[in-house]
């Protein structure tokens, strides 16, 4: 990845709330399926904004280190009826589409949304808020901490 896109908590909440608005009216939804781990954060915002209390998880491991995607491993799958009909599946982003394709097979009738989308996977989700170039790594706020940054003159 040659570029980085740093997301702050404020930015993330703003984008997740925008996604929530697009999912109104809330009465059409039975619940949320959060894709662990990145989808847990937007799921919390969606649950609050839409007044939903039924939250399930699907746990898929694909990034085995910070930069490299590996073979998908389904660690846990939410058991919901009718292929996820009436459920929102949410993840933080769709990148190559590998995880999204697996999710689509598991929950073909769910509404699949993400906060961020890269070109290779964007067509696999029903809605998203922000376009991100394919060669850009997203630094999510839950992966960051506050730290001292030395002045440029000291490098």
Swiss-Prot record:
GO annotations of cellular component type: cytosol; plasma membrane
Keyword DNA-binding on entry: no
Molecular-function annotations in GO: guanine phosphoribosyltransferase activity; hypoxanthine phosphoribosyltransferase activity; magnesium ion binding; xanthine phosphoribosyltransferase activity
Superkingdom of the source species: Bacteria
Gene Ontology biological-process entries: GMP salvage; IMP salvage; purine ribonucleoside salvage; XMP salvage
Pfam families noted in UniProt: Pribosyltran (PF00156)
Family: Belongs to the purine/pyrimidine phosphoribosyltransferase family. XGPT subfamily.
Protein topology in the membrane: Peripheral membrane protein
NCBIfam families: PRK09177.1 (NF006613)
Stated name of the protein: Xanthine-guanine phosphoribosyltransferase 2
Cofactor(s) the protein needs: Mg(2+)
InterPro entries xrefs: PRibTrfase_dom, PRTase-like, Xanthine_Guanine_PRibTrfase
Reactions listed under catalytic activity: GMP + diphosphate = guanine + 5-phospho-alpha-D-ribose 1-diphosphate; XMP + diphosphate = xanthine + 5-phospho-alpha-D-ribose 1-diphosphate; IMP + diphosphate = hypoxanthine + 5-phospho-alpha-D-ribose 1-diphosphate
Matching CDD domains: PRTases_typeI (cd06223)
Amino acids binding 5-phospho-alpha-D-ribose 1-diphosphate: 37-38, 91-99
Organism phylogeny: Bacteria, Pseudomonadati, Pseudomonadota, Gammaproteobacteria, Pasteurellales
Residues annotated to bind guanine: 95, 138
Residue sites binding xanthine per the record: 95, 138
Species the sequence originates in: Haemophilus influenzae (strain 86-028NP)
Pathway note: Purine metabolism; GMP biosynthesis via salvage pathway; GMP from guanine: step 1/1; Purine metabolism; XMP biosynthesis via salvage pathway; XMP from xanthine: step 1/1
Physiological role: Purine salvage pathway enzyme that catalyzes the transfer of the ribosyl-5-phosphate group from 5-phospho-alpha-D-ribose 1-diphosphate (PRPP) to the N9 position of the 6-oxopurines guanine and xanthine to form the corresponding ribonucleotides GMP (guanosine 5'-monophosphate) and XMP (xanthosine 5'-monophosphate), with the release of PPi. To a lesser extent, also acts on hypoxanthine.
Keywords: Cell inner membrane, Cell membrane, Glycosyltransferase, Magnesium, Membrane, Metal-binding, Purine salvage, Transferase
Oligomer status and interactors: Homotetramer.
EC class: transferase
Binding residues annotated for GMP, in chain numbering: 95-99, 137-138
